[in-house]
């Protein structure tokens, strides 16, 4: 079986594939100060909950945007799984040209999402990933990674507001307001955070569309994708398992090359 790991700044998502079928997946907090032994203890508990024995995992592929986690996961794989992990990078031959001025700058998670999305749709695309940062990644109709945009995530933006505006309360950001005009402070903040962020998404997507040769399909992934798809006018599809599927696709391509 194949273990796929996507390490983000806030959360780490893991999944186990049996051929092309995802058997199970988990979302855990990214702990930069952990050790390979502590990671194994946590992973073992997750595996046991799904009756997965570590010895049946024969390969691991990782996308990671948190440099300290590379050493930890490399040691975990070697010590407890008996193999070295494959690390996703722009230098790999994944069947997708990276048309960035410096391809090495492209985050592994952005590449993974782009590969998975194009494999699924085979069309011009904008992939929006709502994570710690919100990334907009553009793929041409011919399957080229064109570049994109990066903005602060919804969580970062709201936390900055809570921290810097001492008289404003901390509000729930996972429930969109019924209207833009808030009738109290909490609803006004929800409007500004959620509907305001939807405006950011729609405005940026419309600008990007004007620069692309073919009209793209707009898809969203990440933890807040379902919420934002309900309030942003330009999002057409939500693909919650995009990153894990992309890791599986890249592993297959690299293994068969």
Curated annotation (Swiss-Prot):
Binding, substrate: 100, 107-110, 185
Subcellular location: Cytoplasm
Essential cofactor(s): NH4(+); K(+)
Domain of life: Bacteria
Catalytic residues (positions): 109 (proton acceptor)
Binding site for K(+): 129
Chain's role: Catalyzes the phosphorylation of pantothenate (Pan), the first step in CoA biosynthesis.
Listed name of the protein: Type III pantothenate kinase
Source organism per UniProt: Desulfatibacillum aliphaticivorans
UniProt lineage: Bacteria, Pseudomonadati, Thermodesulfobacteriota, Desulfobacteria, Desulfobacterales
